[in-house]
């Protein structure tokens, strides 16, 4: 394999860099988007219980905001700078937009690698084919020509190998983020029902 990489020359190096970067992004997002870090299972119940006990002082709300992405959204529903449920929902939507942006970190880059990798592989193959035919003289060995073409095609194959997991994981993470955001909105609405529909609510 090392010999093939050396034969492919400079066009293969962008693909190698892309593959390493894609792997790093996949690992980073897999860790960052773990459900327990985004949507702590008992957080909503704890917040509702604290609200009913009148324990959600500004300091507690600030601490909730730092708890997790869900905590940030729930905290926005408890801010005292809005007087109506509609105003609270606007705060929730604004917090949700910030959270969505943070959860989507690096996903665009991962998707771009998945899109560009096959093109880089094709570029390597084209460059290799040009070099092969330019070096051929009359009476050249057909076996050497066939081997040169075979080696050049490795570049396209490598590009596809890099692209497939990048595209699949990009789509998986995008779906995961979308699902998280829907669930955050649902939990925020359930909290607002408690805040605005019970005695003592705003």
Segments the model singles out, each with a brief description of its role:
Residues 1-43:
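Hydrophobic membrane-targeting segments
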